[in-house]
Every structure is written in C-alpha cells, then in structure tokens.
Amino acid sequence: MSLSIIFMGTPEFSVPTLRSLIDAGHKIRAVYTQPPRPGGRRGLDLQKSPVHQAAELLGLPVFTPVNFKDQEERQRFRELDADVAVVVAYGLLLPEAILTGTRLGCYNGHASLLPRWRGAAPIQRAIMAGDKKTGMMVMKMDKGLDTGPVALTREVEIGGTMTAGELHDKLMQAGAKAMAEAMNKLEYNELPLTEQPAEGVVYAAKIDKGETRIDFSKPAADVHNHIRGLSPFPGAWFEMEIAGKPERVKVLGSELAEGERAVGEVLSDDLAIACGSGAVRLTKLQKAGGKPMAAADFLRGTPVAAGTILALGPV
C-alpha cells in the first residue's frame, strides 16, 4: 500500500521532501508550485521554481495556479482524488476548499518548534533572536497561520556561529525525513495529533529591507545574531567610505570578539568592531557587485585602519 499525494511547494527547501515521499513508495498524483517568474540578467526570461524543475525531471504533472479563487481550479484539485496533500513552503494561501479537498486533509512541514515562530521567516528569526534550538514540525493544516495540530517534531540544535543558510540546509534534510516518516505512519492510521499550546506564540514576520542594516550600538551578541540570521540572504550591511564614496558592504560572517571602545570603532587590523557592549569580528564580507570574500582578502583591497569609526546603523 501507499498514499496518493498532491505535493505543494516552491523553493529548493521543498525539493528533498518531494523526493523523500517518492523514495518511501508513495504515489505523487500532481505537483503544485508557484508560476514561473521573470528572471535572467534583464528579467526577460521566465524561470521555473526549483520544485517545478524537479517535478519535470521526475515526470510528474505540474500545476501553477496564481491562486485558488477560481472554482475550476478547486474542482481540478478535488478531481485528483488524492489521499492527502503535503505542503512545504508553497507560498500561497490555501482556502478551506483546498484544505478539505483530499481524503485526509493537508499536512505542512514548518521550520520551527511551534507555536514559536509562526509565519514567513522562522529560520532567520530563530537565529536573530539567539535561539539555541529549532526544528521541523509536521502539522495538519487548518484555516489559521501555522496553528494546526502537530503530528511529528524533529529538533535541531543551532550552533553559535551557524548562519541562516546553514540552518536552512540542515532543516531541509530533517524536514524531508520527518515528512516521509509522518506519511508512512498516516498510511496506517498511526499518526496522532497534538494541539499546539496557547502559550509561547511568537510570529516570524517576513524580513524587511529596512531592518537589514547593522546597528553597532547594540550589544555584540545581538549584532552577531543579526549578521548570521541574515546570511547569506538578504545580508546584513553597514556603510563605509571606499575610494572617497560611501558604499554598502554586506557582512556574511562574524564572531564575538573582545574590546570596549566607541561604538562602531575598528579595534584591530582584523576587523574587530566595538559595539554597544563587547565587540564583533567581521569574518566574511561582500562589496556591492562583488563576490563574498574572507576578511583578510577584503582588507587587502580595502584597508581599514584601527581607530576608524564605521557608520553606526539606523538613525
């Protein structure tokens, strides 16, 4: 036996789960993903999502509705006659007609330990908040925002220097295994559900460009968490003068350092920067239009003398 599944996902994060369900022996009736988006150097080429590309390689039918407001779109979903829908970072709101459009409902893979970090950016927010652990949860979806009962949890430790990109990859693999395990249990009616607690609800708002600038007036631990929580995308940044002009420099890696000076002052020739309390050492940087590079390589092309005061951050 196996389950017949409608898979719904869009980014690279979703692809291992799709493959894991197939490897577990389940039948994928169809794949739903977001429509192709303009891409390429001039934005003239339509680029299919990573899930779309993977589904085509696997020989699976792909649907790309803009939304599910159309009755014909809802009817097509129901007529697939699937046992269950699996949703991983799909990116579209699902109406009640879709949530109830399969025999067993919709199950979502969410990258946090719910109810902490409900919403769009749980990976980044967990690191930015200094959390020591997070995880992947499989939950049965309801009409709320990540409010459904939990079926399975897999915790993941967050290392002190781990970036959002590194945590993304770790959770991506953990989530693939967790969803396959959950569907195997669901097939035999062995997947109990537990309601989320009412306490501890925190929302993971989408990252806004306005919050990406580094504020060195904050404690060093907060600055360090800010940098690694936004690495590699969209990237935390500060402004400095290069060749007589102010330029943004992204910081993609950092570590805690020692030292107390004026806020934003460069303490040493290895880019240790004084913060509101303590200091951070910038270890990986990227100039506008350039490639990421180690601090030593950055400094060879752009010397920064000890005693230099960098822009402090938001004003």
From Swiss-Prot:
Its EC number is 2.1.2.9. (6S)-5,6,7,8-tetrahydrofolate binds at residues 112-115. The keyword Transferase applies. It comes from the Bacteria. InterPro entries: Fmt, Formyl_trans_C, Formyl_transf_N, Formyl_transf_N_sf, Formyl_transferase-like_C_sf, GART_AS, Met-tRNA-FMT_C, Met-tRNA-FMT_N. One of its GO terms (cellular component) is cytosol. It catalyses: L-methionyl-tRNA(fMet) + (6R)-10-formyltetrahydrofolate = N-formyl-L-methionyl-tRNA(fMet) + (6S)-5,6,7,8-tetrahydrofolate + H(+). Disulfide bonds: none annotated. The keyword Glycosyltransferase does not apply. Keywords: Protein biosynthesis, Transferase. GO terms for molecular function: methionyl-tRNA formyltransferase activity. Pfam families: Formyl_trans_C, Formyl_trans_N. Belongs to the Fmt family. PANTHER family: METHIONYL-TRNA FORMYLTRANSFERASE (PTHR11138), METHIONYL-TRNA FORMYLTRANSFERASE, MITOCHONDRIAL (PTHR11138:SF5). Attaches a formyl group to the free amino group of methionyl-tRNA(fMet). The formyl group appears to play a dual role in the initiator identity of N-formylmethionyl-tRNA by promoting its recognition by IF2 and preventing the misappropriation of this tRNA by the elongation apparatus. This is Methionyl-tRNA formyltransferase. It comes from Rhizobium rhizogenes (strain K84 / ATCC BAA-868) (Agrobacterium radiobacter). The gene is fmt.
